[in-house]
């Protein structure tokens, strides 16, 4: 069989330096004089960055309180005992009293922390309907199967929001009070609850369905709240810009954590007389205790924290840089010893 010139050249690449692999190239020769300085320079750079990150993290002030309510740990233990073994424990209130001997430098962020809570579980992580959370009316009425068993209520109504993540929404609440003078009255400290969610989540991923006759409640008519919720999603807040699927607390909770111990932002303290931080004095945190954690062996903590240019307190990144830098330096010394030892042997062989 004879091929024509046209057939032979039909699939040939262009005769260019790029397609014919004739581009100029350079391949470094990794000799000891090149590799050893690279290891030492990389190690010093990592150690320098690690020290900066570590000391920056250590400079962040934190004040934390475990209010799980284990027996004998404070007045929250009464609330924990009252809700033991119940899916929906009765509302209960407790308080945390503390004093600050000096200014707690701001801005101050208020977090809640949960332990032994695996939001990274595969079945838990996919138990949501992103189309429903984006406000699509069709998805509101027809949640995806991944939401099961929190897809439809016992009456057959679609659950909004559906899924295990939404059903386990953290629902404790806090208020902060300050006693400026010993024996004086407590004054409530304003907690800024706005802007605590990621901008892309609040403005892009989470949207409410279209209003019906100007009412969000009518838009959710024919749906049911998750089983563990005490009220429907459109009553999460009296603020129309912070209720429904765009409620800040809800949006923060729906961004799942990668580790079983995690923190989520609850509020910022940056208004009025507290814009520079928390002044010295006595404080009281009123806690509405709703969220049960003892059933799965977890703990819940309340944390006041300042921040730095790198964010909140996190020594892991600095330690990781220090470890990598130290390994680079150690590897460099090992390679240097090997090079010196075998270089002498090579010189003897050449002679």
Swiss-Prot record:
It is a multi-pass membrane protein. It comes from the Eukaryota. Its main location: membrane. The chain crosses the membrane at residues 34-54, 316-336. Residues 55-315 are exoplasmic loop. Keywords: Cell membrane, Glycoprotein, Lipid transport, Membrane, Transmembrane, Transmembrane helix, Transport. GO terms for cellular component: endoplasmic reticulum; Golgi apparatus; phospholipid-translocating ATPase complex; plasma membrane. Component of a P4-ATPase flippase complex which consists of a catalytic alpha subunit and an accessory beta subunit. Interacts with alpha subunits ATP8A1, ATP8B1, ATP8B2 and ATP8B4. This is Cell cycle control protein 50B.
């Amino acid at each position: 069989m004879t091929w024509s010139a046209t057939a032979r050249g039909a699939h040939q690449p262009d005769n260019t330096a790029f397609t014919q692999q004739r581009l100029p190239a350079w391949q470094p020769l990794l000799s000891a004089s090149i590799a050893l300085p690279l290891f030492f320079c990389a190690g010093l750079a990592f150690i320098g960055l690690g020290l900066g990150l570590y000391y920056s993290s250590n400079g962040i002030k934190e004040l934390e309180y475990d209010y799980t309510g284990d027996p004998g740990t404070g007045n929250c233990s009464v609330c924990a005992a009252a809700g033991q073994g119940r899916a929906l424990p009765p509302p209960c209130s407790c308080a945390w009293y503390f004093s600050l001997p000096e200014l707690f430098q701001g801005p101050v962020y208020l977090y809640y922390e949960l332990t032994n809570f695996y939001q990274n579980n595969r079945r838990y992580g996919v138990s949501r309907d992103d189309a429903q959370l984006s406000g699509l009316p069709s998805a509101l009425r027809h949640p995806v199967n991944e939401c099961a068993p929190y897809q439809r209520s016992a009456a057959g109504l679609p659950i909004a929001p559906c899924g295990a993540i939404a059903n386990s929404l953290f629902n404790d609440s806090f208020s902060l009070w300050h006693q400026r003078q010993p024996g004086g009255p407590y004054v409530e400290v304003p907690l800024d609850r706005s802007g605590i969610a990621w901008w892309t989540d609040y403005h892009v991923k989470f949207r409410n369905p279209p209003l019906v006759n100007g009412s969000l409640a009518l838009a959710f008519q024919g749906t049911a709240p998750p089983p563990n919720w005490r009220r429907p999603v459109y009553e999460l807040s009296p603020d129309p810009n912070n209720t429904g699927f765009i409620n800040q607390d809800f949006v923060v909770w729906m961004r799942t954590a990668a580790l079983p111990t995690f923190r989520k932002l609850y509020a910022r303290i940056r208004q009025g007389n507290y814009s520079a931080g928390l002044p010295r004095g006595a404080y009281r945190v009123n806690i509405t205790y709703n969220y049960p954690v003892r059933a799965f062996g977890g703990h819940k903590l309340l944390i006041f924290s300042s921040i730095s240019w790198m964010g909140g307190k996190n020594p892991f990144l600095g330690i990781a840089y220090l470890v990598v830098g130290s390994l680079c330096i150690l590897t460099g010394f090992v390679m240097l010893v090997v090079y010196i030892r075998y270089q002498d042997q090579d010189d003897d062989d050449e002679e």
